[in-house]
């Protein structure tokens, strides 16, 4: 069974999904960023971004980073 992400941050069609895993050295987070698009009636995802996606991409990544930092500060 695939593990579900613990947080999803979305701005427009840019989405970041954050996963949490426990390792020997402690808690680790990883982030996958995708751009959503429609191909006819079907929604798909891409890991490629155009020039106009970059401002939103920067904001989504910053929010993901902030969320991860806040998790590390919680007891």
Each PLM stretch: what is its role?
Residues 1-75:
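Single-stranded nucleic acid-binding surfaces, predominantly the OB-fold ssDNA-binding core
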């Amino acid at each position: 069974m695939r593990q579900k992400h613990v947080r999803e941050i979305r701005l427009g069609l840019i989405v970041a999904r954050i996963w949490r895993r426990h390792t020997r050295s402690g808690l680790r987070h990883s982030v996958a960023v995708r751009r959503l698009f429609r191909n006819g009636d079907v929604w798909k995802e891409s890991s490629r971004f155009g020039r106009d996606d970059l401002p939103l991409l920067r904001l989504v990544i910053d929010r993901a980073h902030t969320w991860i930092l806040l998790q590390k500060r919680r007891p």
